[in-house]
Amino acid sequence: MAMVNENIVVRLAQDADIPEAKQLLERYHAKNLAGEQRANGFVTTDMTEQQLSELSSAESGVVIAVDRSCDKVIGLLLGGSWQFLSPWPMFKYMASILNEYRYQGKKLDAASSYQYGPICVAEEYRGQGVGELLLEYQRKVFAPRYPVIVTFVNVLNPRSYAFHTRNQFEDVGFFNFNGNKYHMMALPTS
């Protein structure tokens, strides 16, 4: 299954795509951006190539957008079960507090939701619907397993927050982790 929009193809990452996906993740990681650069959005999740590869093979958790005109990975969206992501302290913490939040009248939980993100699109491709294509594709991949998507957005990242609210994510509350404040957000997979 692949989605095509003009020259952009959205699909699951293959082993050969992982190094380029990692480069894109590093390009927009907060640790690699100066303060003014962060205004255009940033990611805070760090993964090695091996971890990305494991996420891809075990969870179908690495969705990429490729520009066919130059055969370049220009977007990515990660996602995985709370169990798979539990080695990351942030995700372990989020899983432990999910039931403190309600979405569509029910308490969130790890059994019926998955962790979405980060989502990352190369600056030169932003505003062209690539993020929406990544989200649409990932929802189809995870819908058979989970009815709800859960993500977090740093309060210092208004660009990301705007993307998520524009795409119907509901802000279900705040939480603090490691000295940062985050929005907890949710969306149905179908």
Report the location of each language-model feature.
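Conserved beta-strand-loop-alpha-helix junction that forms the acyl-donor binding cleft
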Residues: 117-126, 151-161
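Conserved acetyl-CoA-binding loop-helix of GNAT-fold acetyltransferases
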Residues: 121, 127-140, 166
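A short helix-loop-beta-strand connector motif used in the catalytic cores of GNAT acetyltransferases and
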Residues: 50-64, 82-89, 115
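Conserved GNAT-fold acetyl-CoA-binding loop/helix
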Residues: 29-51
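Conserved GNAT acetyl-CoA-binding A-motif
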Residues: 112-116, 142-154
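A short beta-loop-alpha structural element at the N-terminal edge
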Residues: 7-23, 34
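Conserved active-site alpha-helix within GNAT-family acetyltransferase domains
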Residues: 132, 155-173
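Conserved acyl-donor/pantetheine-binding loop and adjacent beta-alpha core of acyl/acetyltransferases
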Residues: 78-118
